[in-house]
Amino acid sequence: MSQPSVILATASYDHTIRFWEAETGRCYRTIQYPDSHVNRLEITPDKHYLAAACNPHIRLFDVNSNSPQPVMTYDSHTNNVMAVGFQCDAKWMYSGSEDGTVKIWDLRAPGCQKEYESVAAVNTVVLHPNQTELISGDQNGNIRVWDLRANSCSCELVPEVDTAVRSLTVMWDGTMVVAANNRGTCYVWRLLRGKQTMTEFEPLHKLQAHNGHILKCLLSPANKYLATASSDKTVKIWNVDGFKLEKVLTGHQRWVWDCVFSVDGEFLVTASSDMTARLWSMPAGKEVKVYQGHHKATVCCALHD
């Protein structure tokens, strides 16, 4: 199977993962996934594999194959896996789960390599661009930085007590992190390197972005925009310089669960409970393609172009 230049995948409560031709909107591959719903999708940096974070396992699929079977299954979590991602060379994978743990997996060997206890259910995990720190957010409102070299929590903060941290995003150059919560608020920090090379958080901005839940926040690769996807059916685009609202993307009929930027930041893909994924032009702020085919809520999407 020849690999398309743009890999676009979505997953739904209909127990399928679908691959789409980004330009035409045609679904060219469907993976049936009866064991569980999929919470998160992530494509490896080399475009070879797609990770599906499920309940309670992670499965790795070959992007270039038509096989419905995963090439690897990662079992060790005991509850919903809510976050998954890869180190820049795809040597290892990280995950976060509602079982209260953050885990590291070596893609070249079976089994969990490292485990960090967050206690509360983990909703979101991101990898710092330095590749040596993971930042997690949990249901109790805690944000923790995990030092992968020291194997310990090097920093902990609570932006809003007893308010779940739903999503985290870190700037590509490692200078900023944004946390979004269930009350529609985004907290922005400047990231500083401490005396012992530990990352320190300097409060920068508090943004009341939506009246409903924020389900995903994401900084664009060009370090220009912050996207916030919400239960209010919209995605809002904020200019990182001052966090002024630039655009509101409207068209979805239900909650917007996920979003992902193209590598140049010119396009955004969104996934919604209205059973669709959509492609948006950032300069125009307009919808340019709808991906239809799922029979239930589309809850996550992955893009690698």
Swiss-Prot record:
The keyword Repeat applies. Its main location: other. Disruption phenotype: Reduced growth and unable to flower under short day conditions. Retarded growth, bushy rosettes, development of multiple apical meristems and unable to flower under long day conditions. CDD domains: WD40 (cd00200). Belongs to the WD repeat LST8 family. Component of TORC1 complex, which is an essential cell growth regulator that controls plant development. Acts by activating transcription, protein synthesis and ribosome biogenesis, and inhibiting mRNA degradation and autophagy. Involved in regulating amino acid accumulation and the synthesis of myo-inositol and raffinose during plant adaptation to long days. Involved in the regulation of plant growth and abscisic acid (ABA) accumulation. Acts as a positive regulation of the ABA biosynthetic genes ZEP, NCED3 and AAO3, and negative regulator of the ABA catabolic genes CYP707A2 and CYP707A3. The target of rapamycin complex 1 (TORC1) is composed of at least RAPTOR, LST8 and TOR. Interacts with TOR. This is Target of rapamycin complex subunit LST8-1. It comes from Arabidopsis thaliana. The lineage of its organism: Eukaryota, Viridiplantae, Streptophyta, Embryophyta, Tracheophyta.
